[in-house]
Amino acid sequence: MGQKIHPHGLRLGITSEWRSRWYADKQYADYLAEDIKIRDFLSEGLDRAGIANVVIERTHDRVRVDIHTARPGIVIGRRGSEADRIRGQLEKLTGKQVQLNILEVKNIDANAQLVAQSIAEQLTNRVAFRRAMRKAIQGAMRQPQVKGIKVVCSGRLGGAEMGRTERYHEGRVPLHTLRAEIDYGTYEAHTTFGRIGVKVWIYKGDVVGGRRESLMNARDERPSRGRRERPRRGGARRQRAEQKQEG
């Protein structure tokens, strides 16, 4: 089941959190339909902004929308004009007061949704699919919190007559382990040969006792501002001579 089910849905309440945070009794269906419309509007209107996640919170008369994006300048616009336009459209869509928060995603290579979108954009620009997949894998594995990544592309790859699926992975991606923090993202590339689907799984370590291994690794592996020590050069003869002098 771990190979087929959505990694976020399988781990809700364990390693992943809900992306819609509100409670409703009789209005549940209306609120859910509104959430779907909000997400569709943002994904279609801000496809160039690199949206990684949209979190929606509701109160009785207010809707709070948190947009996690790699390019906040596109979402905000000049002097906040684009953000005001988006807020107005969302208020017209929901009929309620909307609080819009725009949050920047700093580590792009460790976010599965942004990695999938990057691969899809390269495929749209006629970059070879193998090169795009390998470049994404190399960029992700350089991050200290990433322990494994799997990338899948499906469609008429390279303009072939028959569609097929290509898979590349590096490191560990334990989809059956519930305590594993798995980030998952999908995107579609619209090419001249048709649509190509891109799926990305990124493993960032385990979550034990509420502590995320990915956060601990990111803190430990921060580069120091001081000068790095160069490795000493020399063969076995020099090492033996130094050992004799010490002895």
From Swiss-Prot:
Query: KH type-2 domain: which residues?
Result: 38-106
Region Disordered, residue ranges: 214-247
Composition bias (Basic and acidic residues) maps to 214-226
Q: Does the keyword RNA-binding apply?
A: yes
Q: List the disulfide bonds.
A: none
The record's listing under PROSITE patterns reads: KH_TYPE_2, RIBOSOMAL_S3
Gene3D superfamilies membership: 3.30.300.20, Ribosomal protein S3, C-terminal domain (3.30.1140.32)
Pfam families found in the cross-reference section: KH_2, Ribosomal_S3_C
**SUPFAM superfamilies per record:** Prokaryotic type KH domain (KH-domain type II) (SSF54814), Ribosomal protein S3 C-terminal domain (SSF54821)
CDD domains per record? KH-II_30S_S3
InterPro entries for the chain: KH_dom (IPR004087), KH_dom-like_a/b (IPR015946), KH_dom_type_2 (IPR004044), KH_sf_prok-type (IPR009019), Ribosomal_S3_C_sf (IPR036419), Ribosomal_uS3_bac-typ (IPR005704), Ribosomal_uS3_C (IPR001351), Ribosomal_uS3_CS (IPR018280)
The entry sums up its family as follows: Belongs to the universal ribosomal protein uS3 family.
Protein name, UniProt field? Small ribosomal subunit protein uS3
